[in-house]
Amino acid sequence: MTKTVDLDWKNLGFSYIKTDCRYISYYKDGEWDNGALVEDNVLHISEASTAIHYGQQAFEGLKAYRCKDGSINLFRPDQNAARFARSCTRLLMPEFPQERFVEAIKEVVRANEHWIPPYGTGGSLYIRPLM
């Protein structure tokens, strides 16, 4: 089993804790690029972003948790992918492919595996995809 970071897992609360990696993909000329894991936790967006001016954004929230046998589970990521796609469609934003959404989540979880609390602590790694 992968070693976890040294935190008081039973008293985490729900505040932001920076992890190692996140996934970023850009949409340009009608298509999504391949996306990649990045270590930078600062979002670099245009001053003309509709998220800033009009609040146009979509987000989801899901959890990764460790099982008794040490394996890691995601709670219904396919349903998160479908909701995210519906949100994007309703907001007239380009839909991120649902299969890629789930794969990107898995990639982020693997890269941040040591941030997932040990089994029995009641904690989980909260993942917040956004567009």
Listing of model-derived features with the role each one plays in the protein:
Residues 1-131:
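Conserved alpha/beta cores of soluble small-molecule-handling proteins
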